[in-house]
């Protein structure tokens, strides 16, 4: 039987994403190609091999790559991703940024079977903050997903296809109030899950960028960079990366430039700026951090500059075109 292009697709991408000799930017493009194949609905015969290929790259020393692997597995919507994600979360020797992303991914998969593990880590006083906080949000998300509340809430249709750590605030009969959402966003006495709901509601009011609510909502989100939680600040940067709104550039630049800021926040700010690569001055800003003392920031800048190049070239998808010949080139 002849080997088809489809048969060689996942193995070729797996070889790239797991190879330490491949440039990081190329490995990321291979990863996003695998994410596409892993997330196809309905699943295909490539779904599980693509998930296994993504999980195989957890042996990499790159914290940036591993955290992105976990994110992509969480977006797959497939139970085959659960076991490798639990393995990363339970590995106390793993980078906390990767473990946090694994916990968030289990929440995105709405895996009830992981609730016991997530609750145990949420309640462990010796666990690092970023993992504890993520487990807290993931538990609330899974319980919301499987609870009665979800069915009774009216949610605004989002422009974004991502499976988020929390749904946006439910719609009411009144017009959404940016000051009210900002108040919830910044209230540290509220559960993180509730504050994240305000965050994603503000995100959805920022897109498309010409909405009259967009700039005020972006400015409200930017005030979240003053929060005491590094996890929360990093999620603000992630949302800005999704939005690619020019009004976020000053706060993202400030976050990246602050060498006292947590590396998980700075790296996310760098990647968000990469999505704004066609805006004036952004590439120059990123290039200043190519030799940053923090490896995850350096790596993020490399990927961000590759993304910026992609934005300028008007390429359709930040991925290697999933065709065997193109991949092997």
UniProtKB/Swiss-Prot annotation:
Its cofactor is Fe(2+). InterPro entries: ARM-like, ARM-type_fold, Deoxyhypusine_hydroxylase, PBS_lyase_HEAT. It is an enzyme of class 1 (oxidoreductase). Binds 2 Fe(2+) ions per subunit. HEAT-like PBS-type repeats lie at residues 65-91, 99-124, 232-258, 265-292. Coiled coil: none annotated. SMART domains: EZ_HEAT. Pathway: Protein modification; eIF5A hypusination. Fe cation 1 binds at residues 67-68, 100-101. Its EC number is 1.14.99.29. One of its GO terms (cellular component) is cytoplasm. It catalyses: [eIF5A protein]-deoxyhypusine + AH2 + O2 = [eIF5A protein]-hypusine + A + H2O. Fe cation 2 binds at residues 234-235, 267-268. It is found in: Cytoplasm; Nucleus. Keywords: Cytoplasm, Hypusine biosynthesis, Iron, Metal-binding, Monooxygenase, Nucleus, Oxidoreductase, Repeat. It holds the Pfam family HEAT_2. SUPFAM superfamilies: ARM repeat (SSF48371). GO terms for molecular function: deoxyhypusine monooxygenase activity; metal ion binding. PANTHER family: DEOXYHYPUSINE HYDROXYLASE, PBS LYASE HEAT-LIKE PROTEIN. Catalyzes the hydroxylation of the N(6)-(4-aminobutyl)-L-lysine intermediate to form hypusine, an essential post-translational modification only found in mature eIF-5A factor. Belongs to the deoxyhypusine hydroxylase family. This is Deoxyhypusine hydroxylase. It comes from Phaeosphaeria nodorum (strain SN15 / ATCC MYA-4574 / FGSC 10173).
